[in-house]
């Protein structure tokens, strides 16, 4: 026997949507060495980050102080190359096709460095999507698996580091929310 139940919708604020974007950014960081999972978390991050401003507008619709303040902020965001890029990538991922991500990868080199006349580097992706790297130092050395370094990029005019761009976008949205909260406190 099954009993039907319905969840009571909880009001979702812009702050909660921001925490959702942070959640997916953290998942991106945790899965940056996984070619299957990272793109999913990136797509979810883009949607969550974009929804923060939608929720902010819905939350304060009809508030004249907010509407005056936000119209100026909206113009600033439209003129911001980073926000435009993130919005365009979100629109592409949501409405057209997956974003054409690329990744740069290589082995982690020990802090003390490596001095050799022969170095072999191996790289592969395992069945679970994890990037694996190995190094062999010297012709007679043993091949050892080492942690991979992975940087996700999009090939625009310049290679843009995805994690750095998303981190900057998060910080700018956080500053926007903080600015509105401070204005609310001043207004009483």
Label every model-predicted segment.
Residues 2-43, 47, 64-188:
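Acidic, Ser/Thr/Gly/Pro-rich intrinsically disordered interaction regions
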